[in-house]
Structure formats: C-alpha cells, structure tokens
Amino acid sequence: MADSRDALLAFIVLGAGAVGTVVGGFWLAVYWMRSLGKKVGYSLAPLGFSRPRGGFLAGIGAGMSVGVGAVLLGMIVNPMSILVLERLGYSTESTIQQPFMEGLVGWVQESPGVAVPAIILVVVLFGPAVEELVFRGAIFNGLYRLGALVSTRSFGKDHGRSSTKTIFIASALASSVMFALLHLEPVLLPVLLILAITLCALFQRTGSLLPPFVAHATFNSVAAVLIILSGLKVLNIPI
C-alpha cells in the first residue's frame, strides 16, 4: 500500500520533471533560433497546445471514441496475449501493474477521502497529460518534423505523399514502441502499442494534444474506476 503511494508520488515528481524538460528544451531551442535571426515565437502550439482541427467538441468526441475503442480492444487482445505468451513458455504474471493496483485498492479501503481524488488526479489526468506531451507532443512530433525536414532537404518540397506516410509510420512506430515498453507489462504490450500508434495518428490528424489526452484519460479511467470500486467494496472483482 505504501509502495503504491510512493510510486504515485515518484511519478508526479518524474512527470513534473519531464514536463519541465520538454517545455524548457523547446523554449531554449526557440531562444537559440531567435538569436540566429529566425522569426519564431515562444508559443507551445508546435507541441500540440492548440485548438484541434474541427473544434474542441469534435476533438473531445474523437478522443473518447478512441479511448473506448482501446478498452474494448484490450478485452479481446489481452487474453490472446496471455495465451500466446503461455504457449511460448513465458510468464504472464504481472510483477508491476497488479501489485501497484492492489496497493491502491488497499489505500482506498484505508483512506478513501484521500486516495480516491489522488487516483483520479494522477492516473486519469496527470499521467495521461504527461505521457501525451512526452510521447506524442515531443518524441513523435519531433521525429516526424525531423524526418520531414530531412526529406525536404534531400528531395525538395515535392517529396510526395508516400514519403510523408513513410515518415509518419517510422516516427509513430519508434515513439509507440518506447511508450509500450515503458509500462513493463508483456501482456499489455500489443494493446498499448496499437493504442500509441492510434494516438499518434489522432495527434497528426487534429494537430492538438487534446484528443489523444482525452483518449488516454478515457482508457486509464476504466482501471481507476475498478480500483476505486474495489476499494470501496462496491465491486468484488480481481484486480
């Protein structure tokens, strides 16, 4: 229980550091470019802090749809992952996520007034916000822009739609593999990889971090609700 609380606190500290690194690094790059005479501003819009194409409601709706779809996909893919791993002789025991979730359930049982809002704030809101900024706003976005720059310098502005697709696929795969591996759960690896690639596409299509954040928060909210309801003994289900 204490370990889970410590893990939440550590994630907040690391997340805040990651946000500071991304934003600070971006502003430092802007400052350097301005010193070279480039006309660039300090707006965080290039990182995805902007209005989604199609508007806020459309972006939120798209994000919720992707999040719900990911939850349903997980219900199908995760059992298949377990079956494949067991057939290959690998352990499917969760050594990180399940003990963490069980600790949070115990915390809810002990101090629901503190635990419930903390879980919602960190698992549903803060965590997805940090991860979307880092993996979609910074890593995927940075790789895609770098690939587009190299392609333009090499082949000119008319490098073609196929080249753009190749750059997207490479950037999405690289950032999504890092995202999936970060969670250290072999059973969840396929669904997390699919989710991450979809979030890259959602970010690319809308030009905003809001839709992928909503999708990520929707996906995480299912686990948060199960933890809270189990801790409050409303549901008696294995975590």
Model-derived features: positions:
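Alpha-helical transmembrane segments in multi-pass membrane proteins
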Residues: M1-F49, T92-M101
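Structural signal for membrane-spanning alpha-helices in multi-pass inner-membrane proteins
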Residues: G25-R34, A70, G74, V123, ...
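Transmembrane helix-loop-helix hairpins at the membrane interface
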Residues: G106-I239
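Alpha-helical transmembrane segments of polytopic integral membrane proteins
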Residues: G25-M33, G74, N78, G127, ...
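Alpha-helical hydrophobic membrane-insertion segments
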Residues: I12-G24, L28, L57, V84, ...
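Alpha-helical transmembrane segments of multipass membrane proteins
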Residues: G17-G25, V66-N78, F219, A223
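Membrane-interface extramembranous regions at the lipid-water interface
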Residues: M33-G41, R51-G55, N141, Q204-T206
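Juxtamembrane helix-loop-helix connectors linking adjacent transmembrane helices
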Residues: D6, G41-G127, R145-H159, G231-I239
